[in-house]
Regions:
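Core of compact, soluble alpha-helical bundle domains
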Residues: 2-176
C-alpha cells in the first residue's frame, strides 16, 4: 500500500490551493508513493550525496511536514496562527522548501519563487514564545523520523537557527 503524501497546492492566481477540511483532519492523500502530483517525475538518483538523499528524500520530508502540521492542528491556540483552514497546503510548502534547502528538487522555487523566509513570515507575530511552541511541534516531527544522531543533529540545528532568525516581535507589548 502506498504511503500517504500530501496533495500539491498552487500559488498561481485563480487556481485552488486546497479543499476545506476540519481542523485536525488527516493530512494524507492517495497519490502514489513519492508523488507530489500525478505528473511528478522525481528521480531519487539525481540527488545522491546530498543531505536530502542521506535523510531519506521525499518520503522523509513528507513525513516530517505531515507530522509537524498534525501536531500543530492539535494545539488550538497555536493553530490560530495559521490562516488556512486546511493545513495540507502549508505542509506541502514546508515539505517542498525543506527538500530544496537540503539539496533535493527545486520544486519550491519553481512554484513559489525565491524562498525569502523572513519576508514570507513577516505578516505573523513571531516572538520567543511562538518560536518555542513552533520548535516544540517541530521536535515532535523530527523525533518521529528516528534519524541517525548526526542527521538529526544537523536537521535540528537548522530548525533551531531558522526559528530564532524569524523572531519579529518582542514578548512584551511596548509601554504606552
Amino acid at each position: 500500500m502506498p504511503k500517504p503524501v500530501l496533495l500539491p497546492s498552487s500559488s498561481r492566481f485563480g487556481e485552488p490551493v486546497g479543499e476545506l477540511r476540519p481542523v485536525g483532519a488527516s493530512l494524507s492523500s492517495t497519490l502514489p508513493e513519492g508523488k507530489l502530483s500525478p505528473n511528478d517525475d522525481h528521480n531519487p538518483a539525481d540527488y545522491e550525496g546530498t543531505f536530502y538523499a542521506q535523510i531519506g528524500g521525499r518520503e522523509t520530508f513528507a513525513k516530517l511536514a505531515n507530522n509537524f502540521y498534525e501536531s500543530v492542528a492539535k494545539d488550538l491556540e497555536f493553530r490560530a496562527m495559521y490562516p488556512e483552514q486546511d493545513l495540507r497546503p502549508a505542509a506541502m510548502r514546508l515539505q517542498l522548501f525543506l527538500e530544496q534547502y537540503w539539496g533535493g528538487p527545486k520544486t519550491y522555487s519553481e512554484r513559489r519563487g525565491h524562498p525569502r523566509l523572513r519576508m514570507r513570515h513577516h505578516p505573523y507575530v513571531i516572538n520567543s514564545h511562538n518560536r518555542d511552541v513552533w520548535l516544540k511541534h517541530m521536535r515532535v516531527a523530527v523525533d518521529s523520523l528516528e534519524l541517525a544522531p548526526m542527521l538529526e543533529t544537523t536537521l535540528w540545528d537548522y530548525f533551531d537557527r531558522a526559528a530564532h532568525s524569524l523572531i519579529n516581535a518582542s514578548d512584551t507589548p511596548p509601554s504606552v
